[in-house]
Structure formats: structure tokens, C-alpha cells
Amino acid sequence: MKKNISKKSIILTLTMAATLVVAALLAWWLWPKNYEEMIPAQAKAVVRIQPAKLQKEVGNIPNPLKSVLGIEANGIDFSQPLYAFVTPNEYIGFVAKVENEEAIETQINKLVAQKQCQPTEEYDNLHWTWLSSGWLMAWNSRMAMALGPGVAQEKDMLRQTITSMVNSSDCFTKTAAYNQLKKQEGSIQLFAQLDAMPTPYNMLFRLSVPADCDPATIQVFASAQINKDSTIINSQITSENEDIVNAINAFEKEKGCIRIANPALCDSTLFVMATSTQGKQLLQLLKTDATLRGLLMGLNQTIDADRMLGSTQGVFTMEISTFAKDWTPTFCLKAETSANNLFADANYWMESAKKQKNVVLKRTSADAFFLSNDKQQLNFGKNATNNALYFTSPSLINRAAQPFIAQKSNKPQGTLVYFHVNLNKLFAQPCMNDGAMKNILKTILPGSHAITYKAETGRKASIIIKD
């Protein structure tokens, strides 16, 4: 005989089920976030440091918090990864798992006494302090985060950004980029959108991709291998858009490879860059940087720099021998060109120069010129010996006639872009005396003597930092 289920029992059962669902949702919503979940999904760059692996490689655990923020890492759980990231509004963030909240509080109190940070405030279930180094720090028993650098007037914006990250359910750990990042080998793993790197620094990567590709759609994944006398960073350039990937692959084949013909000169020069390029692509890329765009606009008021650079096709190199105190370089830029009559309008240029204040343009030979204004002096022309269009500082005019430091390679695979910096020479330049840039480089490259970057076919790149 079947039992009749009363209406009251049905209502009670449904009520209990609904209560359980609501409780589960509330628990999910209110459950404390993992420290890794503080990183926003739209982060433009993320660096993942695994201290345990790093200690095995180098014998100790570097303290990025000390070198960047000016604080010790007391209370941080070094058994778990540390993260640095770039927020969508382009602040730099650090986040780590907390092992001992009291140790952090003790350290902050000492800094307050030393007037290196402001007294701690508490709200939104977080402790907050403003570090004199320009960082806003927030922490609790689970995580410690710092965001900056900024000035005191930016504290409200930094606070809003941290609060938004804490309260958001949209985090980097739920993205495909995070899964790809974790697959990278090494103790230090990196993800970055190409637009997270400011111009002109991202040009090293952009020289190996089509100029019309949106940098925001291009991703770089990398890992660092730390050896006894060098650090090697291997990276892969890719995109979530398959059309972009196909465009980069096609561009590599069209661009062609180079080989370095004079390694000794590269090692002894402050700065060397070499690649193979087509003029229109090069010109389009140079104009993405405001400083270079302004420089070209200034030159175009007197000469047709756009036409000259647009005519190039083949090897393109740049050498810098010195930087002045204001970072003005002594340089030699050369590019292969087969174009004739590049200077057919030279007489018009010289007449135009006469109408401009403090501008002098002289023709020193059929295909050679000297240009000066109140900011710079420049030799430019075409050398028949090596078919090189050149723009050079007067003191490096002899380099214009010398063979290119790189040559085209007939191999289908190899180097697309080469870049070398002699750090010993860089640190000796007058522009490094004031300390700001020197301190940054000394902090991130302690004891290093040279940096070499190579972009390779297959959307790969490597950075070698020699100690």
C-alpha cells in the first residue's frame, strides 16, 4: 500500500533543498580567495617565481621585495610561488602567500618607527600601509600584496585597484594563459602581452612580427634557466588568434634570417642591433614609438627621411658607442638599399634648410650630406661600397663604409633579430651617473656584464645574461 506524501512534506523537502543550495552558493561566494586568485584575469604580464627550485639552482633565495619595495620578506611562505604582475591600468603588483601574519606586522611596525612607511590601517578585512618607496601594501593571514610604484596622490587609485582585485571573481588562474605559464620549464616563468612592454623596448619582439599586428593580441611565454655564469631566458611568441599565428609564421619566411659576421665588434661595442627588414615595415614600426616618430617628423621637415628609409630592403643594423648625460646617443644606423636617385631632391632640401632657424644642410659629396640643428649633428647618405643607406653621428662616419656586422643567411631557419648590450660600457656612460636607471639595472642584473637577445624562426627568442 502506497504512502501518501503530504503537501507539508513536499514543501519541507523543497525548503531544505533550497536552503542547502543557497548555503553552498554563499559558502562559495564568501570563501576566502587563494592568494594566486588576486591576480586579475586581464593582467598584461605575470612572472611566477618558484623559490624552492630557485634555491636549488643558485643556492639561496633572492628577495625581490627587499630590492624593489625596500622591505624584508618576513612572514612570507617561500614554499609557494611568488608572483609579480602588471595590472590592466599598468601598475606593477607583487603577491605572495603569508606564513606568519605577526611577522609581517612586526616588520611594518619597525618601518613605521623608522619613518619608512605610514602607520597601519585596517578595513575590508585587510591591513594597509603606504611604503615610502612608493608602494601600497595590503595583507591578511592568507596573502600579502604590494602595488605601485606611485606618488602619494595615487594612493586612492592604488587602493581601489587592490580592492577590485580582492573582490573580483575574474582571476588570472582561470585563464588559458595561466595554464600555459605553468607549463614553462624553469624556476622563473613569465607571461606577457606584447603591449605590456613599452616602446621602444618591445621593438625587439616586434621586429620579428608583422608591423600591423595589434601588440595586445600577441603573447610571450618564457622561462629562465640560471647557470653558474649566465642566465638564459627562452621564450615563445604566440597568440590566441590563429590568424595572428599564421601571419607571424608567414612573416618569418618573408623576412629571412641573418648571421653575425663580426662577433668581436658586437662584443666590444656598447649596443648593437641587427636584422633583415623591408623599408615600409621598418618605417611603420618606428612610427609606433612617440620619440622616434617625433625624430622622423623633425628630419622630414628638411629631408625626405621617410622615402629613404622606405627604400631599404635587406640587412638593417644599428650601433651605439656612447650615451651623453641626457641619453643622446652616438650612433651609426645602416640599411641595405638598391634604390637609385634617393637624393634627387637634394637641392630643394638645401633651399628648405636655409628657411629654417638654426638648420644647416651641406652636400659633402654626390651621395653624402651633413645636417645640423640646435639639437644634433648628423651625417647621412649612401655608400656605394656596401649599398648602405646610413644615418650616423659625425664621430662614427667611418663605420658607414665598413662591412655590415650581419649578413643575410640562405638558411631557412636561424636568427631573425640580434641585439647585444655591453653592460660594463653602459654603466660607464655619463647618463648613468645620476643613479635612477643605474640602480634599476644593478638591481635586476647584479654582477652582469652583457645581454644578448636573439629572435629565432619558429616564433622563438632567447635572452642570455652573462655574469
Range-by-range predicted roles:
Residues K2-L20:
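N-terminal Sec-pathway targeting helices
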Residues V21-P40:
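Membrane-interface motif at the C-terminal end of an N-terminal transmembrane signal
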Residues V47, N74-A177, Q313-T415:
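Single conserved position on a long alpha-helix in the C-terminal lobe of the eukaryotic protein kinase
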Residues R48-G70:
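Short extracytoplasmic
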Residues L30-K33, A73-L82, A216-V220, E254-R259, ...:
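Short amphipathic beta-strand starts and helix->beta connectors
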Residues A52-K56, E90-I92, E101-A103, G279-L282:
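Primarily extracytoplasmic ectodomains and periplasmic/lumenal surface modules that are beta-strand-rich
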Residues E252-K253, R259-D326, E336-F343:
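Extended non-catalytic domains of envelope/secretory-pathway proteins
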Residues M16-A23, M165-T275, H420-D467:
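Leucine-rich, highly hydrophobic segment in Treponema pallidum outer-membrane-associated proteins
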